C-alpha cells in the first residue's frame, strides 16, 4: 500500500507525521470518497511529485475516475483561485469593482457531490493559505449542513499532508547531498 511507502520514507524526525498520516488514513469522520479525494487534492496542492504518485496509487483503486479527476480539478482550480483571491484581498479593496474574468466551471459542475468538492477545495485552500477561499468554502459547507467535525477533519488532513510533503522534500534533498 502506498500510504505505507510514504510512512516508510519519512525520516525518524518526522515520526509524528508518520503516526498522524496513519491515523488520518483510517478516519471515520470522512467518507471514503471524501478522504481519498482530499488526500489526492492536497497532495497535488503540495507540488510534491513523490507524494502525489504514492497517494494516487492507492486512490486510483478506491475512487471512481470521476472522483479522482474532480480531486485533481479541485487542486488545479484552487491553485488559480487561491492566488487570485488572496492577492485581491491583500490589496485592500482597490480592485473589488473589477470582474475576475476567470473560468471556474468545475466548481459548479465537479462530477461529484458538491459537498465533497467543496471539502477538497477547503483543504487545498488551507495548504495555499487563502483566507478568503477558506471562509467561502467553509460557509458553503456549513450552509449545506456539513458537520463542523467533518470540516475540521479535512483541515487536519491538509495540515498532515503539507507536513509530510515538507518532510519528504527535506529527506530527498539531504539524500542527494
From Swiss-Prot:
Xref: SUPFAM superfamilies? AhpD-like
Q: Which Pfam families match?
A: CMD
The highest taxon in the source lineage is Bacteria
Q: Does the keyword Magnesium apply?
A: no
UniProt-annotated catalytic positions: 130 (proton donor), 133 (cysteine sulfenic acid (-soh) intermediate)
What reaction does this enzyme carry out catalytically?
N(6)-[(R)-dihydrolipoyl]-L-lysyl-[lipoyl-carrier protein] + a hydroperoxide = N(6)-[(R)-lipoyl]-L-lysyl-[lipoyl-carrier protein] + an alcohol + H2O
Q: Which cysteines are joined by disulfide bonds?
A: 130-133
- EC number from the UniProt entry: 1.11.1.28
- Keyword Lipoprotein set for record: no
Q: Which UniProt keywords apply?
A: Antioxidant, Disulfide bond, Oxidoreductase, Peroxidase, Redox-active center
Q: Which GO terms describe its molecular function?
A: alkyl hydroperoxide reductase activity; disulfide oxidoreductase activity; hydroperoxide reductase activity; peroxiredoxin activity
Q: How does it assemble?
A: Homotrimer.
HAMAP family on file: AhpD
Please give the function described in this protein's UniProt entry.
Answer: Antioxidant protein with alkyl hydroperoxidase activity. Required for the reduction of the AhpC active site cysteine residues and for the regeneration of the AhpC enzyme activity.
The family classification in the record reads:
Belongs to the AhpD family.
Name by which UniProt lists this protein: Alkyl hydroperoxide reductase AhpD
UniProt organism field: Mycolicibacterium smegmatis (strain ATCC 700084 / mc(2)155)
Amino acid at each position: 500500500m502506498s500510504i505505507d511507502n510514504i510512512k516508510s520514507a519519512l525520516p525518524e524526525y518526522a515520526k509524528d507525521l508518520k503516526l498522524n498520516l496513519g491515523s488520518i488514513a483510517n478516519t471515520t469522520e470522512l467518507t471514503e470518497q471524501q478522504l481519498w479525494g482530499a488526500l489526492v487534492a492536497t497532495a497535488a496542492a503540495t507540488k510534491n511529485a513523490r507524494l502525489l504518485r504514492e497517494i494516487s496509487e492507492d486512490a486510483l483503486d478506491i475512487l471512481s475516475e470521476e472522483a479522482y479527476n474532480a480531486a485533481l480539478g479541485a487542486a488545479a482550480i484552487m491553485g488559480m483561485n487561491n492566488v487570485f483571491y488572496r492577492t485581491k484581498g491583500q490589496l485592500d479593496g482597490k480592485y473589488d469593482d473589477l470582474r475576475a474574468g476567470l473560468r471556474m466551471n468545475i466548481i459548479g459542475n465537479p462530477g461529484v457531490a458538491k459537498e465533497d468538492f467543496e471539502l477538497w477545495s477547503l483543504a487545498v485552500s488551507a495548504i495555499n493559505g487563502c483566507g478568503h477561499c477558506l471562509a467561502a468554502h467553509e460557509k458553503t459547507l456549513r450552509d449545506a449542513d456539513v458537520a463542523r467535525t467533518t470540516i475540521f477533519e479535512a483541515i487536519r488532513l491538509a495540515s498532515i499532508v503539507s507536513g509530510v510533503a515538507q518532510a519528504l522534500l527535506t529527506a530527498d534533498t539531504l539524500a542527494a547531498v
